[in-house]
Amino acid sequence: HPGTNMVFLCQPNNPTGQLAEPALVEALLRRCEAVGAVLAVDECFLDFLPEGEGLSAKHLLKNSKKLIILKAFTKLYGMAGVRLGYCLCSDTELLARMRAAGQPWAISGLAQAAGIAALDETEYVAKVRALIEAQRPVLADGLRALGLRVIEGRANYLLFRAPEALGEALRRK
């Protein structure tokens, strides 16, 4: 659409957990380039998938200045209070503008140390991924057994639809 400056894509989608195929992400990037828009891809939950690295749009960075990829330590490593994430982009001018618009304080020493330590936790990451792969169908089956409609997804979360009466009952509690 004319006048569009940025398109934002969650990979996997939040709240459905659905994945966009890499070819679709690339086609979306090419369309953004054609109209002068930036494609921002939030890959913060992609790290939970064993095949996440292969689904990342990182390989598209070398040929496009219209791509921003957002990543976070806070999700996979359970460090929400540390507030540590990063942005990948090959457009140095855009990065400079983002840096200038950012918060005036630097990342704390504690956050830096936590991030560096997290990078060495490959065994932890493998265990978390395996646990999610094993427990996602168990949780989905349990929700279905309660009569809830579960939307199949690949993320570490599930979207389900409950009857209106359940929502009303929970609000009253």
Regions found by a protein language model. Name each.
Residues 27, 31, 59-63, 138, ...:
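Alpha-helical structural signal in soluble globular domains
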Residues 132-133, 141-173:
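Conserved PLP-binding catalytic core of the aspartate aminotransferase-like
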Residues 6-10, 40, 86-88:
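Structural motif
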Residues 66-144, 148-151:
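PLP-dependent aminotransferase class I/II
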